[in-house]
């Protein structure tokens, strides 16, 4: 047999994303853009003494600038258009499935249109809403093999599709469903009927909170400080007894980062589980303190406060 050597990368190849990123980096650097050290998909440069940011997600670009002159903004777009054919959508109101609602002192990020879409997709548009995404007494950790009857019941159920759709929400604008979705995602290989009922409960919860989202408010320089709230359960998972860490990070009153994740080793006590959550939050704090500095908004030099409710884990480092 023979092997053909391609003269250029084409869409669909394994190396196509890497080749596109290398080309994009080269082109943007040639017109003065510099990638962030802590987030290489964000670029910055100066244009007529005005700082400009460019957020890149594959081939979707979000241009951020304080420039008021339409001419400057047009010139910035024309520079990018000199390399690629672009579609200018004007002021950002929708980006990567997220609605952006601008007001004088804040921006609200929500996904109401996407929620309506998935409710229709899974025939839950007219369902009865509930006030919580998950019930604590439901044994959703059960990983037993499905019976033949249960396999038949789940044969054509779009469980994997539903989990994927919900994960898209939970990592972007809906931290309130992160625990429920993370728990249900453990069963995509062989879900049981009760897991599908739990998925539908998450959808019913979304039905009653369609317009909820994140509100990012202006923060005075004197209040620009990072706070992190960390917590953990202890051995809640009856199958492997791994605990779950959770954290929410805020600047001012705005939530900018969150995490809900199973721990990788078994904690011998609630103190150990909480201490692991503290450790993960401390690692997040390093990155979260550095990233705003690249935007020119460094948190105050005071140490980042991580809030915890377990006295043992707070006293442990002092011993």
Where are these regions (language model features)?
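Long, low-complexity, charge-biased intrinsically disordered regions
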Residues: 1-319
């Amino acid at each position: 047999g023979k092997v053909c050597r391609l003269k250029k990368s084409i869409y669909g190849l394994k190396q196509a994303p890497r080749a596109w990123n290398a080309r994009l980096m080269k082109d943007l650097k040639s017109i003065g853009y510099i990638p962030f050290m802590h987030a290489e998909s964000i670029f910055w440069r100066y244009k007529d003494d005005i700082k400009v940011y460019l957020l890149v997600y594959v081939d979707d670009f979000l241009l951020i600038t304080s420039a008021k002159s339409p001419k400057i903004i047009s010139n910035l777009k024309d520079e990018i258009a000199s390399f690629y054919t672009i579609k200018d959508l004007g002021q950002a109101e929708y980006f990567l499935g997220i609605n952006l609602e601008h007001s004088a002192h804040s921006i609200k990020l929500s996904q109401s249109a996407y929620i309506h879409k998935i409710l229709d997709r899974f025939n839950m548009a007219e369902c009865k809403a509930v006030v919580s995404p998950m019930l604590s007494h439901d044994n959703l950790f059960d990983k037993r093999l499905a019976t033949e009857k249960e396999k038949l019941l789940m044969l054509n159920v779009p469980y994997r599709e539903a989990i994927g759709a919900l994960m898209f929400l939970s990592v972007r604008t809906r931290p309130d469903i992160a625990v429920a979705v993370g728990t249900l995602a453990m069963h995509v290989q062989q879900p049981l009927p009760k897991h599908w009922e739990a998925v539908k409960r998450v959808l019913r919860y979304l039905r009653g909170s369609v317009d909820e989202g994140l509100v990012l408010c202006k923060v005075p320089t004197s209040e620009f400080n990072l706070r992190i709230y960390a917590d953990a359960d202890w051995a809640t998972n009856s199958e492997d007894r791994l605990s779950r860490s959770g954290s929410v990070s805020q600047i001012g009153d705005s939530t900018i980062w969150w995490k809900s994740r199973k721990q990788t080793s078994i904690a011998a006590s609630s103190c150990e589980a909480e201490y692991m959550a503290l450790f993960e939050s401390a690692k997040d704090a390093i990155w979260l303190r550095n990233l705003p500095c690249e935007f020119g908004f460094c948190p105050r030099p005071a140490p980042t406060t991580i809030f915890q409710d377990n006295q043992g884990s707070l006293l442990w480092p002092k011993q």
